[in-house]
């Protein structure tokens, strides 16, 4: 009840509208029975992501949240060379710079962020070979971690 009294004093403020939106979204999510998968960040991907400009973090964060609830954001595209839609890339432009985050949804109970980087234009839109090799190594690390997490889950 105190929440209603407090919110009533806000009038039509942006904060009230945002809380109303979150409340409705949470209710819909709970009623749908959807679960939110945890996000695991491989090695430096979280630190690298946090260095992106705030608007880029916001946009990519929302795309990752959609992956957590089993949806695919419109800006998420399969990364070429990884055989299908198991490894996806989010691309965001900001003030003339391009930022990318690569994640995988190939695991039933988790989303792994494999790499986050600012694209340096050396070869057009193509992802540099060094980054692709790094993503492959980190995907293997994610597979190993997921296997360990599954074994822990079976043991408990």
Regions found by a protein language model. Give the residues of each.
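Hydrophobic/aromatic beta-strand elements that line small-molecule binding cavities or substrate pockets
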Residues: 101-103
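Active-site beta-strand-loop-beta-strand hairpin of nuclease catalytic cores
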Residues: 105-113
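Basic, Lys/Arg-enriched alpha-helical interface segments
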Residues: 2-98, 107-108, 120-156
């Amino acid at each position: 009840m105190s929440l209603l009294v407090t919110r009533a004093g806000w009038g039509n403020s942006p904060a009230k509208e945002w809380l109303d939106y979150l409340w409705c979204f949470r209710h819909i999510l709970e009623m749908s029975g959807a679960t939110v998968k945890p996000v695991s960040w491989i090695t430096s991907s979280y630190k690298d992501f946090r260095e992106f400009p705030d608007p880029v973090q916001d946009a990519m964060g929302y795309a990752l949240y959609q992956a957590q609830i089993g949806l695919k954001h419109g800006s998420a595209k399969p990364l070429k060379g990884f055989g299908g839609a198991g490894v996806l890339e989010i691309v965001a432009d900001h003030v003339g710079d391009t930022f990318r985050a690569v994640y995988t949804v190939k695991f039933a109970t988790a989303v792994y962020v494999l790499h986050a980087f600012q694209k340096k234009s050396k070869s057009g839109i193509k992802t540099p070979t060094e980054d692709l090799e790094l993503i492959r190594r980190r995907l293997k690390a994610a597979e190993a971690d997921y296997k360990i997490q599954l074994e822990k889950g079976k043991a408990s």
